């Protein structure tokens, strides 16, 4: 049973027409789709809902980049409304597991599990663009079945809530009591408010400010 942060997170519809980049070399031309070309620069995109498919792709890309160079940072760009808790935790655990620092950057929005992954980046390397929006809240879910089964799943979602709030407290520096209160309902923040709260470290207005 998957518990979703996002009430109406749809299945990904794809990114539409993907531009191609042609590189010239001594051995001729080589064409890449734009995302594969950016992967060479250690840039990964989390765009749209967080689900098993997107999680598997992101985990695979992080593991590949670690094998390529375990001492060089990875850059995770996030524009997501949130989604599956289990899929998001697969990404989270991999971010903490691999050797390279994962720098996170919110472009557009990072809501619910998107916000959780944003704040899970390496300390000092978590960023927002000026007009980004960040939203945190408690996990959501529903289950139908026998009363005993509903009780089991209710206990599980309460366990996940406590677990996720504890991790948010760790990454933001807020107390568990503050996190419990502030995630009780949808809690939207501007980029500047996200810095004050500890979800990110800095608002970037130009690439030079990242220090990368």
UniProtKB/Swiss-Prot annotation:
Sequence similarity: Belongs to the peptidase S14 family.
| Major localisation | cytoplasm
Mind telling me which residue stretches traverse the membrane in this protein? none
Catalytic residue positions? 112, 137
Print the keywords alphabetically: Cytoplasm, Hydrolase, Protease, Serine protease
Q: Can you state the subunit structure given in the record?
A: Fourteen ClpP subunits assemble into 2 heptameric rings which stack back to back to give a disk-like structure with a central cavity, resembling the structure of eukaryotic proteasomes.
Q: Name its species.
A: Thiobacillus denitrificans (strain ATCC 25259 / T1)
Recorded protein name is ATP-dependent Clp protease proteolytic subunit
Task: Give a short account of what the protein does.
Answer: Cleaves peptides in various proteins in a process that requires ATP hydrolysis. Has a chymotrypsin-like activity. Plays a major role in the degradation of misfolded proteins.
What reaction(s) does this enzyme catalyze? Hydrolysis of proteins to small peptides in the presence of ATP and magnesium. alpha-casein is the usual test substrate. In the absence of ATP, only oligopeptides shorter than five residues are hydrolyzed (such as succinyl-Leu-Tyr-|-NHMec, and Leu-Tyr-Leu-|-Tyr-Trp, in which cleavage of the -Tyr-|-Leu- and -Tyr-|-Trp bonds also occurs)
Q: Cellular location of this protein?
A: Cytoplasm
Q: Which Pfam families match?
A: CLP_protease
Q: Which PANTHER family match?
A: ATP-DEPENDENT CLP PROTEASE PROTEOLYTIC SUBUNIT (PTHR10381:SF70)
Q: What GO molecular functions are on record for this protein?
A: ATP-dependent peptidase activity; ATPase binding; serine-type endopeptidase activity
What are the GO BP annotations of this UniProt entry?
protein quality control for misfolded or incompletely synthesized proteins
Signal peptide (from-to)? none
């Amino acid at each position: 049973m998957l518990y979703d942060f996002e009430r109406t997170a749809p299945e990904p519809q794809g990114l539409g027409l993907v531009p191609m980049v042609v590189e010239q070399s001594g051995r001729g031309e080589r064409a890449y789709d734009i995302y594969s070309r950016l992967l060479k620069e250690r840039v990964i995109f989390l765009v749209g809902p967080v689900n098993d498919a997107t999680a598997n792709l992101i985990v695979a890309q992080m593991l590949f980049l670690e094998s390529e160079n375990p001492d060089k940072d990875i850059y995770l760009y996030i524009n997501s409304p949130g989604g599956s808790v289990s899929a998001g935790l697969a990404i989270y655990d991999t971010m903490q597991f691999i050797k390279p620092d994962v720098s996170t950057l919110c472009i557009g929005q990072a809501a619910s599990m998107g916000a959780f992954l944003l704040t899970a980046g390496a300390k000092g390397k978590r960023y927002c663009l000026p007009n980004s929006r960040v939203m945190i809240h408690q996990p959501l879910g529903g289950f139908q079945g026998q009363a005993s089964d509903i009780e089991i799943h209710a206990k599980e979602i309460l366990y996940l809530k406590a677990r996720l709030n504890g991790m948010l407290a760790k990454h933001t520096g807020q107390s568990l009591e503050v996190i419990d209160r502030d995630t009780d309902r949808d809690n939207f923040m501007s980029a500047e408010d996200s810095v004050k709260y500890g979800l990110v470290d800095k608002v970037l207005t130009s690439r030079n400010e990242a220090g990368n």
